[in-house]
Amino acid sequence: MNPVFNDDLKKLFGGMRYRSVSTYLKDKFGEKTIKLAIDGGFTCPNRDGTKGTGGCIFCSDSGSGEFASDIEDQIRLFSDKWPRAKYLAYFQNHTNTYAPVSELREKYYAVLANPKIEGLVIGTRPDCLSEEVLDLLSEISRTHFLWVELGLQTIHNETARLINRCYDLSVFDDAMRRLSVRGIKAVVHLILGLPGESREEMLDSVRYVSSLPELFGMKLHLLNIVKGSQMEFPYPDYQPFASIEEYVNLVVDCLEIIPPEVTIHRLTGDAPRSILINPPWSFNKRTILNSINDRLNLLDSWQGKRL
């Protein structure tokens, strides 16, 4: 147990009650650091028939990212407000290691040729990390900042089949081990509110991932039902949580069992209002985050308190 919110934790968390990735990056680079969403033009083995078709049931046609645009356009957008900001290029949509290594090399290094880009964030699947791909990522990590994001979503096999994930937990475990051997940082995505999962099952997924010694960061997504996903018609009225309060209480319980050194990359969903179906309150990201912070302060709680 960590019964005291001491000065070391306050410094680690940068004045917050959890270790946000924004705080981590500000400490590392000395300036605000912004991720720029990149669409690399990749597809997914869960869409092209290699593993499945249609993708995971929560994904829209454009994949998990909905905001990708040109790098320079994005930098111009941010530079007026943060003229000294640092930038990471985030290959977000679909599976960004699912291509011949020669193509990956060309696309990754083309982005890194921009002197304003400090490094890469690469979203992918655990079953799309061949030895050749890992060798390329290891090569890049020796000269540039890099982390890899893995979409696990749940540790429960029944839920994994329901969401059409198309790989076993053992594949994820092996990918984490092989990333660790090469010293490549790994961030794991989990979704809160998947159909059929109980509150305790969601917490079990958080506990499992939190126990991995090689874990760098975690994303906790609120399940968003969006237009263009396979959930749009079978689950149009599905509400993953009855209220924002129920969701906030669960997130606080999750944070309390995540080790303090793990970076927190997301605590809610982020679907644009134009495609969001449910839950209707989830488009107001700032309200959700403020409610989480208020709850942590009210309970005098913090990331890792229960460990």
For each of these PLM feature ranges, what is it?
Residues 1-88:
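N-terminal [4Fe-4S]-dependent radical SAM core
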Residues 62-74, 78, 82-101, 116-129, ...:
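Core AdoMet radical
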Residues 78-82, 107-115, 135-145, 177-181, ...:
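Acidic (Asp/Glu)-rich catalytic clusters
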Residues 34-38, 87-92, 120-122, 146-150, ...:
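Hydrophobic faces of well-ordered beta-strands that scaffold small-molecule active sites
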Residues 1-23, 32, 224-307:
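Auxiliary Fe-S-binding modules of radical SAM enzymes
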Residues 170-229, 245-268:
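Conserved C-terminal portion of the radical SAM core fold
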Residues 56, 112-117, 204-219, 288-303, ...:
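Structural recognition of alpha->loop->beta junctions
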Residues 105-109, 138, 198-216, 244-245, ...:
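Short, electropositive alpha-helical surface patch
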